[in-house]
Amino acid sequence: MQVLSGADRFGAQAGEPPHWVEHLSVPDLSVGTYSLPAGSVDTQDPHTEDEIYVVLRGRGALATDDATADVGPGSVVFVPAGETHHFVRIVEDLTVLVLFAPAEGARASTTGM
């Protein structure tokens, strides 16, 4: 067993760029915190792994090619591998717990990331 503590304390502050902090990585899973200040632009590329986002704090929306959904504390969103997605309309500093399966980078990239 490994207990992770403090993941909810990581967060980008106003004026800082979005950032990623990895907390755990094993072959089949990785977990980290992705933080985006209010008004920032999310420039991430699609990943080769399935993702689950759990919003810890803040408000915004997650947009894919097919839909846009408002998210806030407690929102849980599944994004399948390869799907284009970005956080948009970030109106409050946003911190999300991100789970990748398998671990981020475990699959070969097909998008030139």
Predicted regions and their residues:
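A short, N-terminal "cap"/entry segment at the start of jelly-roll beta-barrel domains
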Residues: 1-33, 43, 109-113
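Short strand-coil-strand connectors
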Residues: 27, 63-67, 90
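Short hydrophobic/aromatic-rich beta-strand segments that constitute the beta-sheet cores
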Residues: 33, 62-64, 96
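Structural motif
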Residues: 52, 59-61, 68, 84, ...
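Short acidic-glycine-tyrosine-enriched beta hairpin
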Residues: 66-81
